[in-house]
Amino acid sequence: LSFYDSLIKDFGADEGDFILSYVISHEVGHHVQEVTGIMSQYQEMMGKLSEKDGNALTVRLEPQADYLAGVVARYQKDQGYLDPGDIDEAISAAWSIGDDTLQKRAQGYVRPESFTHGSSEERTRWFKKGYEAGDLSEWDTFSAKNL
């Protein structure tokens, strides 16, 4: 629960119980990346890249986990588990932990070349994309022309 508290107090996310679902679903998304072999391919490539190129690759990994969190949210909606405002809570959480938002808050300026998790806009867009699709049909952030 400490990360939940940080999202609210330190990062400015809207308060709500669905934030926990978003965070857990995002982390489960990383597990899906692990069992599908994406994570091992990512780790192999990271060993061959400069820091800048490694950051650019990592920025492709994180929104994919946000996409998967969106797929889970869609399932929850289809099952009737969501309350009004839940999706807005998840979007607020994703926005609040985008690299640009975090950097601006911490240092007053943004350095896109140092991003490791994607911008607020990218993170929320991929969450929404997963929510709208409701399946894995559009989850390939690595081949996407634009994040």
Model regions: which residues?
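Short helix/loop segments within enzyme catalytic domains
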Residues: 53-56, 60-102
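Pan-zinc metallopeptidase signature
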Residues: 97-147
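Active-site recognition of the HExxH zinc-binding catalytic motif
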Residues: 22-35, 66, 70
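Soluble non-cytosolic domains of exported or imported proteins
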Residues: 12-23, 52-63, 81-85, 117-121, ...
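Short linear capping/connector segments at secondary-structure termini
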Residues: 44-51, 108-110
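Zinc-dependent metallopeptidase catalytic helix centered on the HExxH motif
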Residues: 9-13, 40-45, 53
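Catalytic Zn2+-binding segment of zinc metalloproteases
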Residues: 28-43, 77
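Active-site scaffold of zinc-dependent metalloenzymes
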Residues: 1-21, 34
